[in-house]
């Protein structure tokens, strides 16, 4: 499984997503969509232009943007 989380620095919801996956022992790749324009472009391609982070993608499939209770992704 390849889980990717597109985030931005200082985002508390992004940190909640990281903490969730870390607590479950699920490995993920964390991309900075704010400061890396190429990653931001990728994120927009998955999310249909939605700028909401975290944006979660698993095995190339868009799972959702944002973080709530219950967690998305």
Predicted regions and their residues:
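Non-catalytic, surface beta->alpha helical segment in thiol-disulfide oxidoreductase systems
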Residues: 58-73
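Structural micro-motif
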Residues: 47-57, 67
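Local sequence-structure signature of Cys/Sec-based thiol-disulfide redox active-site neighborhoods
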Residues: 1-29
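Thioredoxin-like thiol-disulfide oxidoreductase module
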Residues: 32-50
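Glycine-/small-residue-rich active-site loops that bind phosphorylated ligands and cofactors
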Residues: 12, 35, 63
């Amino acid at each position: 499984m390849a889980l990717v989380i597109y985030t931005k620095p200082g985002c508390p919801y992004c940190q909640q997503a990281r903490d969730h996956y870390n607590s479950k022992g699920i490995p993920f790749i964390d991309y900075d969509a704010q400061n890396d324009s190429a990653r931001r472009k990728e994120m927009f391609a998955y999310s249909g232009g939605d700028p909401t982070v975290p944006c979660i993608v698993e095995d190339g499939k868009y799972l959702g943007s944002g973080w709530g209770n219950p967690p998305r992704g």
